[in-house]
Amino acid sequence: MLSQEFFNSFITIYRPYLKLTEPILEKHNIYYGQWLILRDIAKHQPTTLIEISHRRAIEKPTARKTLKALIENDLITVENSLEDKRQKFLTLTPKGHELYEIVCLDVQKLQQAVVAKTNISQDQMQETINVMNQIHEILLKEAHND
């Protein structure tokens, strides 16, 4: 089935991609899960634990544990909401912002090097991004309907 092959093709690149990015993250003493949440906060700050859990499709306890490590490493700050004391807003610290910028640059260089070794056009990449975003939205909706 073509749909099965379609999904399997994305699953098969995931592990090799992680292996290529691991040295970059290790150099900066950050794990991949921490990086994904740090990047999410950078793109959506201020944000909350619940919003991160929803966007990343991870359980709140998992996100909470990762956030604790990021807080302990002085990469993010937590501020109570003025309207609702139960709600806490997360933002990057200056150290977190600096790390985000450095790791982004290193990862972008890696990604550009990989793409340069292929014959993928800009249009093909954009179409793939569009399709993956559509699928991501559907999967998030399905996951939250359970």
Swiss-Prot record:
GO molecular function: DNA binding; DNA-binding transcription factor activity
Keywords: DNA-binding, Transcription, Transcription regulation
Domain HTH marR-type residue range list: 1-137
SMART domains cross-referenced by the UniProt entry: HTH_MARR
Transmembrane segments: none
Top-rank taxon: Bacteria
Gene3D superfamilies linked to this entry: Winged helix-like DNA-binding domain superfamily/Winged helix DNA-binding domain (1.10.10.10)
PROSITE patterns per the UniProt record, alphabetical: HTH_MARR_1, HTH_MARR_2
PANTHER family hit by this protein: TRANSCRIPTIONAL REGULATOR, MARR FAMILY, TRANSCRIPTIONAL REGULATORY PROTEIN
Matches recorded under InterPro entries: HTH_MarR-typ, MarR/SlyA-like, Tscrpt_reg_MarR-type_CS, WH-like_DNA-bd_sf, WH_DNA-bd_sf
A single BP term in Gene Ontology: response to stress
Protein name: Uncharacterized HTH-type transcriptional regulator SAR2349
